[in-house]
Swiss-Prot record:
Gene that this sequence comes from: ARID6
Domain ARID: 106-197
Assigned keywords, A-Z: DNA-binding, Nucleus, Transcription, Transcription regulation
Organism domain of life: Eukaryota
Entry's family note: Belongs to the small heat shock protein (HSP20) family.
Source taxonomy: Eukaryota, Viridiplantae, Streptophyta, Embryophyta, Tracheophyta
Record GO biological process: glucosinolate metabolic process; regulation of transcription by RNA polymerase II
GO CC terms in record: histone deacetylase complex
Official protein name in the record: AT-rich interactive domain-containing protein 6
Domain sHSP, chain residue ranges per copy: 305-398
InterPro entries: A-crystallin/Hsp20_dom, ARI3A/B/C, ARID_dom, ARID_dom_sf, HSP20-like_chaperone
């Protein structure tokens, strides 16, 4: 099957062969959104108005109807500075003192959204209501969840953003819960919180929460609070240790290549001092084997076709009878990643997310892995596990 997309990029290939996955299709992400989290529009109907029926005069009925309608409109209209301060305090008292539902009613959600919009407008700041998987995010629930934990600084210091995000029931495929909801809060509510703190309207027991919640720190295996590049580099290091044991030389199994330097530097130093020159020579030969392994790993050339996708990590290793390609494509499902191979020694990895407007900035990409020998595309296989870890075995041409 010839890939017409590759011909448009002026790349010369032979007959590209589709590579099939070896495991079953993962389950589709469930729609776990809570309907109460999505703000509903407030209908300003007059179905409950009497319209003058049953009253002692038509004028009395009209006055009663206008008063009820005026009360409804005032609930959504911008307040003066003094009234805004009282309303902001009410949001905290309702959630903390009375223990009501953090999500709030649809009326409360819309009212709080209007209040935040008015604050940003008064501060001459741009405000864009956040969306999570295409649905408006309940910022009232996000505000109450963070404030009840002690505010932005406490949640960030104690790495509680995952706990905040889990309360929104994100899909199982969402692997950046902490980063996503911290980003939502920073863009929509952080300036609002700072203003309340500076005005003395928001007093939170930060030190007490830091001590009490230290045990509930967020696991850092797949999450991080740093930049996107730092998180992806961490994921790449985890991918390198995925296949920890490999064959070296005449079938000898070595230890994993990814280790903590602090754990191996001190024992090595002691052995060199105690044993002497003979042990030093043996260590040098082992270093030579590791160097050869590194050279084999960096032998392949990876080229981007179209926009550069530096967040996709690809490593290639050469074994006795095949090439082994280890790739990390976080945020993509198996059906969104396409693999093709050419007998001339080229493997094409294409990623096409179904949802282009995603909160992680995942964009379509195409990478060509140029191997150093001819391959057998008919026996090429791929396995994709959780968190976007992709393994491709490419046998040599027989």
């Amino acid at each position: 099957m010839v890939d017409t997309e590759m011909q448009e990029q002026d790349v010369t290939f032979g007959a590209l062969v589709e590579t099939k996955y070896l495991e079953e299709e993962p389950l589709e992400p469930e729609n776990d959104h809570n309907p109460s989290e999505i703000p509903q529009p407030l209908l300003l109907g007059d179905g409950q108005a009497n319209n003058g029926h049953g009253m002692n005069g038509g004028a009395v009925g009209v006055v009663d109807h206008s008063e009820r309608k005026t009360r409804r409109v005032q609930m959504l209209s911008p307040k003066t500075e003094g009234e805004n301060a009282k309303k902001r305090k009410t949001w905290l008292l309702d959630s903390e003192a009375q223990g009501t539902d953090e999500a709030g009613t649809p009326v409360e959600q819309v009212a709080f959204l209007r209040e935040v919009e008015a604050f940003y407008k008064e501060s001459f700041l741009e405000f864009k209501p956040p969306k999570f998987y295409g649905q408006p995010l309940n910022i009232l629930k996000l505000w109450r969840a963070v404030v009840n934990l002690g505010g932005y600084e406490v949640v960030t210091t104690n790495k509680l953003w995952r706990q905040v995000g889990e309360s929104f029931n994100p899909p199982k495929t969402c692997t950046t819960v902490s980063y996503t909801f911290r980003n939502f809060y920073e863009k929509a509510l952080l300036e609002y919180e700072k203003c309340l703190r500076n005005n003395g309207e928001l007093n939170l027991p930060g030190s007490t929460l830091i001590l009490s919640s230290s045990v509930e720190k967020e696991p850092s295996s797949h999450q991080g609070s740093g930049s996107g590049r730092a998180r992806r580099d961490s994921a790449a290091r985890a991918m390198q240790g995925w296949h920890a044991q490999r064959l070296v030389g005449s079938g000898e199994v070595t230890a994993p290549a990814v280790k903590d330097k602090g754990l191996i530097s001190t024992p090595k130093h002691k052995k060199l001092k105690s044993i002497g020159l003979q042990k030093h020579k043996q260590q040098t030969s082992m270093d030579h084997v590791v160097t050869n392994e590194a050279d084999k790993q960096l032998a392949a050339e990876v080229v981007d076709v179209g926009p550069v996708a530096d967040w996709v990590k690809i490593n290639v290793k050469e074994s006795k009878d095949s090439f082994e390609i280890f790739a990390l494509v976080p945020g993509l499902l198996r059906k969104e990643v396409r693999i093709q191979s050419d007998p001339a020694g080229k493997v094409v990895i294409t990623g096409q997310p179904e949802q282009l407007d995603n909160p992680w900035g995942i964009t379509p990409f195409k990478k060509i892995v140029d191997l150093s020998a001819r391959i057998d595309p008919l026996h090429t296989s791929a396995v994709m596990s959780m968190h976007g870890r992709l393994f491709i075995r490419v046998p040599f041409e027989q």
